[in-house]
């Protein structure tokens, strides 16, 4: 009974006051192995309990945060949609009508950098938005600058050839026309005054060469023409030539020094004058050669060998 009472008393004692039961000898290792698992059980239970207790908190927290998350998700979706919309808007081109382009071009010709107020006015006139007008002016200025730059590059690249050709052309004119006419043709007109100073004896035998130079009527009247020359006039030719040269008046000299008769000047009709003078000089020389050969004056043509081709032909 006492033992029963003692057992009853131990059973009635609270669990915290009960002494631990003595471990059996054969169950020692199993007890030690199972012992560390004992404290884990309450941890797992506590973890499970904490998870159980936290789940409703998350559920409770998820309930108020749901709209925010959904709102954030909505904004996120909206944010994802907005860039797509913006990209689509950027890729979308604005097709301007001819009237709008005319108005924009006219305004661009007047002012290439319109301010905000002017752009707004243009937008009202053209039925466009102000950003679209601003973008159009920006693109138009870029196109204008590119065109100006290309024009400057073209001028710089092609500027050397016109300058070179401009420098060459005057020289070609000088050598082709100026040199061949102004010098050679002038020499064909100039042998009379040169020969009167250097070759007086030869000039005395050819008064027609001076006639080609002095075109004054008085000098022509004082000289004999080739048609009037005959065999009877040849013996008196030296004296008549010297008399004609000595009888030249100031008027004939002034006419010889006039700009029209100047050997370095350009006559009004150069080719016709040059052709006439060449024909007359050649005809006179042929006539004189025939006359000199007929009267035995062939030796008088010796001084002509010292002249150049231009003076000899004249």
UniProtKB/Swiss-Prot annotation:
UniProt feature, compositional bias: Pro residues? 17-26
Q: Which residues bind DNA?
A: 89-148
Transmembrane region(s): none
Tree of life domain: Eukaryota
Q: Which Pfam families match?
A: Homeodomain, OAR
User: Where are the Phosphoserine residues found in this chain?
Assistant: 46, 48
| Coiled-coil segments | none
Q: Which UniProt keywords apply?
A: Acetylation, Activator, Developmental protein, Disease variant, DNA-binding, Homeobox, Nucleus, Phosphoprotein, Transcription, Transcription regulation
What SUPFAM superfamilies does this protein's entry cite? Homeodomain-like
Q: Which family does it belong to?
A: Belongs to the paired homeobox family. Bicoid subfamily.
Spell out the residue ranges making up region: Interaction with PIT-1.
147-279
Q: Where is the composition biased (Basic residues)?
A: 85-94
Q: How does it assemble?
A: Interacts with POU1F1.
**Modification N-acetylmethionine, positions:** 1
User: What disorder does this protein's entry note?
Assistant: Clubfoot, congenital, with or without deficiency of long bones and/or mirror-image polydactyly: A congenital limb deformity defined as fixation of the foot in cavus, adductus, varus, and equinus (i.e., inclined inwards, axially rotated outwards, and pointing downwards) with concomitant soft tissue abnormalities. Clubfoot may occur in isolation or as part of a syndrome. Some patients present tibial hemimelia, bilateral patellar hypoplasia, and preaxial mirror-image polydactyly. Liebenberg syndrome: An upper limb-malformation syndrome characterized by the combination of dysplastic elbow joints and the fusion of wrist bones with consequent radial deviation.
Q: What is this protein called?
A: Pituitary homeobox 1
Q: Which InterPro entries match?
A: HD (IPR001356), Homeobox_CS (IPR017970), Homeobox_Pitx/unc30 (IPR016233), Homeodomain-like_sf (IPR009057), OAR_dom (IPR003654)
Cell location: Nucleus
Work out whether the entry's keyword set contains Nucleotide-binding: no
Which species is this UniProt entry from? Homo sapiens
Gene that codes for this? PITX1
Instruction: Relate the protein's function as given in its record.
Output: Sequence-specific transcription factor that binds gene promoters and activates their transcription. May play a role in the development of anterior structures, and in particular, the brain and facies and in specifying the identity or structure of hindlimb.
Q: Which SMART domains match?
A: HOX (SM00389)
Q: What results from changing residue 130 to K?
A: In CCF; reduces the ability to transactivate a luciferase reporter gene; suppresses wild-type activity in a dose-dependent manner
């Amino acid at each position: 009974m006492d033992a029963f009472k003692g057992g009853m008393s131990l059973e009635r004692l609270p669990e915290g006051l009960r002494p631990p039961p003595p471990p059996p000898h054969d169950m020692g290792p199993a007890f030690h192995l199972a012992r560390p698992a004992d404290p884990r059980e309450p941890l797992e239970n506590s973890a499970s309990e904490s998870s159980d207790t936290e789940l409703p908190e998350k559920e409770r927290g998820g309930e108020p945060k749901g709209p925010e998350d959904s709102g954030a998700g909505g904004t996120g979706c909206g944010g994802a949609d907005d860039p797509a919309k913006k990209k689509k808007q950027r890729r979308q081109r604005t097709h301007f009508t001819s009237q709008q382009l005319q108005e924009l071009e006219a305004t661009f010709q007047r002012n290439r950098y319109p301010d905000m107020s002017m752009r707004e006015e243009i937008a009202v006139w053209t039925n466009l938005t102000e950003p679209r007008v601003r973008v159009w002016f920006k693109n138009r200025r870029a196109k204008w600058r590119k065109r100006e730059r290309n024009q400057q590059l073209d001028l710089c690249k092609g500027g050397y050839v016109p300058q070179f050709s401009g420098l060459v052309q005057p020289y070609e004119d000088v050598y082709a026309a100026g040199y061949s006419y102004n010098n050679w043709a002038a020499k064909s007109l100039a042998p009379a005054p040169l020969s009167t100073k250097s070759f007086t004896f030869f000039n005395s035998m050819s008064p027609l060469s001076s006639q080609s130079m002095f075109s004054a009527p008085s000098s022509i009247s004082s000289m004999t023409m080739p048609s009037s020359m005959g065999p009877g006039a040849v013996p008196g030719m030296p004296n008549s030539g010297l008399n004609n040269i000595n009888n030249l008046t100031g008027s004939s000299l002034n006419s010889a020094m006039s700009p029209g008769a100047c050997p370095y000047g350009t006559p009004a009709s150069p080719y016709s004058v040059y052709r006439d003078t060449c024909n007359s000089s050649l005809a006179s020389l042929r006539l004189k050669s025939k006359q000199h050969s007929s009267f035995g004056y062939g030796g008088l043509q010796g001084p002509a060998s010292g002249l150049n081709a231009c003076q000899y032909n004249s």
